[in-house]
Amino acid sequence: EVAPVQPGQRARAGTAPTARTRPGRSVVLSCCLVSLVAVGLLIHAGLTGKQRPARQPRVHLSGKDLTGYAPHTVHFNYDVSEVEADTVFIGVDGPSVPLDKKKHTFSYFYGLPSLYRTRIIAHNRTLSTLQVLVKSRGWEANLDNNYELSPHVAFEKDKGRLYITPESIKPLVTTKDKIFWTGYRNVQDFDADGDNFTLETRIKSNAEEGGIRCFDTEIEVIGTRANCRITLVEPGCSNFIRLDISDVHKSGRTDDLSSFAQDYSGWGRVKVRVCDKKAEIFFENKLIHRLSYQEPIGAIKGITFWFKGVGSVDYVRLYNAQNQPVYEDDFEKPESAATVSRFAGE
């Protein structure tokens, strides 16, 4: 006996035919239906198999004088005419800039030495990339308070360290809260692999010599593919620590990085050792952190130091994968020191 179909319900497959339906006709209809479904599935499978992903628009990006010394201007050549987007951007240094799709030339001024990764962007996707290496002539320095600096502020040259006296930059500090950062950078081809190197240095920051509370200090190795950056602070300030090594990013707010809170009001020795994408950080010869990462850092192109307020660097030593020195500087010679860059916010 067949249960009646309730209003709004569909008959279940396999229910017996009613008395007004001839069995022969039902079988024929069922066979036809099965055949049509099978054909439909085959057609769908064929169409699906032939579908190809949307074609990536052809984008051209090249440049003239992609390597030079700061200050430096690069002239980019581009073609984004095939990109289906209302606005196409070029990311240089800082906020992305919209491109004129009808034109093919864009120039940009780089005030500070660094390795810059230029990108063509549309719909929040990177369509093309290009690197610009702006080198320094030895060590250069700048003060970061988002203002252009005077080119006449010099380092101390007779104490064997990188150091700017607070008095020499006091007229340049224009932020209302008097919070500023000083930085030292050396950008060049260091002939070392960012995934196999050792960096040794000695740093100092304290209130008496111009450091600002927590004495945040950043040490960064710049690679062609990614960067390696560590932060040190005084004890009690670990909330402000950042650790960025290639694709690994940690914050003192969400990770326990208290081992990076150290006393370097006198001199503190720091060593960063990377071997086969495994990084170890030492303070005063004691291992304070280790991690592994996946994405390569690439060839080393720069070393930078940033101090909250003013800080000192006693020496810098860089070794390659064979533990051979590829760069050393103890800042005993006057020519090791340099003047403050005029362009702190570029």
Regions found by a protein language model. Give the residues of each.
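Extracellular Ig-like/FN3 beta-sandwich strand-entry sites
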Residues: 113-117, 194-196, 265-267
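Extracellular/lumenal mature domains of secreted and surface-exposed proteins
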Residues: 12-168
